[in-house]
Amino acid sequence: MQRDQIALPFQWPVADRDEDFLVSDANRDAFTHFTRWSLWPVMATLLTGPRKSGRSLLAQIFVRKTNGRVLDHVEDRDEEELFHAWNDAQARRRPLVMIGDRPPPAWKIRLPDLASRLAATPQVAIDEPDDELIAQLIVKLLADRGIAAPPDLPEFLVPRIERSYVAIQHVVDTLDRDILANRKRMSLAAARHALQEAGLIRRAQRRA
């Protein structure tokens, strides 16, 4: 008897093009903030938002255009490192993008000079995804893996999955594995079955 084939995940290319960052009301303020960087009071900004929200992608697109620098996970970095990076950005006139889960004072800063510089630094946040962005991301992330989403799939999933970027990623990963394992074209029925088995969808809920 032939053993069931194990679906092995492929390493998909990392998105880094302008069109890879999808804009909706959930992230429009952040997107606009970076297009108007010449108006920043200092050559630095703090970008916060949930993990998997595209915050690193937006920052990388920006620094590629401006010859800037990105520092991710700033809450966990040495304060002296942040202090010198901020000063260096001003001296070189190269914008610094600091990325974190939350803005200060949610993470305690002991170095007074760093605290004063961050207080003068503009901050912008990406919110949890809205319905429009959830639908766009499902279609795009599946397309990035060579999978055509059925036209009715986004509308079905939007009210049934958790409203978070991590949940969207789990949904796409699950559908990708199901397609690889079963070697068949995706349908709404097959997607619903795979996601129900994984515990990723619930009864449709009315969005506020």
Regions found by a protein language model. Give the residues of each.
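Pre-Walker A adenine-sensing motif
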Residues: N27-L39
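Conserved P-loop NTPase "ATPase switch" module shared by AAA+ and STAND
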Residues: K65-E81, A85-D88, R92-P103
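Conserved AAA+ ATPase "SRH/arginine-finger" region at the nucleotide-binding site
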Residues: T121-L133
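Conserved C-terminal helix/linker of AAA+ ATPases
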Residues: I179-E197
